[in-house]
């Protein structure tokens, strides 16, 4: 087994390598003056089982192209099997046609990864579970729920805890965490009565006097979580925190969270901290390196990955 890292998240790659007690394969990744990407693998990988570690996070197009070129380099270097380890799968929100003459970009990206030569994909908390079906190669979608559960038990009293989905689409995800914590759930139902009218946050569930934890797969601008926290507090919640797998945190989302009424926002290291963002103690990071490392070990040894979640 060999591990190779792209440039999207080198700290996470090193943490995964440390977990597996395996070195990162020597490689050289360079961007030419015109923006083109060049990759050279500096070790023999012929006949090897190679795991290429690369999130397709910001800048999404650069990191996606880098992943494809790394896969192509491994194919041409005669690697026996290539697994694309993509902690954060970019373009996942474009998983369906949203209108006439629009693409399904998540499917296109899945096709590109397979066509480049990847034999399988390993990722974490896809925005929509059905994206697994977009790939024509084996795909393992890991869940960070147990990572979140362990942290919540360390930092929160669970007796009066309420797990809240910030939208109707995230109910299954919220219910899974609530089951682990033996907690109840509530739902924030966002509705816009008509064009030009502000969204109304309807709360489904009893939140008065409860300590609420919003649980979602992704935080981009932070607006949804901040607004949901305000709605919960106005309905009588004692406090509101948020746990999110992928902290994309664009458009100074950290500054928005810092000024919000959220107690804290907890994200994982699937995405690197955005450059030039407003630092805030309200944003805390957990690592998914042990989760990914164990899944990689199991894949390399032809063991069950699903048993991680039994």
UniProtKB/Swiss-Prot annotation:
Positions of D-ribose 5-phosphate binding: 192, 216, 220-224
Entry keyword annotation includes Magnesium: yes
Compartment list: Cytoplasm
Residues bound to Mg(2+) 2: 167
A Pfam family matched in the record: Pribosyl_synth
Active site residues of this protein: 190
Subunit structure, as described in the record: Homohexamer.
Protein name (database record): Ribose-phosphate pyrophosphokinase
Lineage, opening ranks: Bacteria, Pseudomonadati, Pseudomonadota, Alphaproteobacteria, Maricaulales
Gene (UniProt): prs
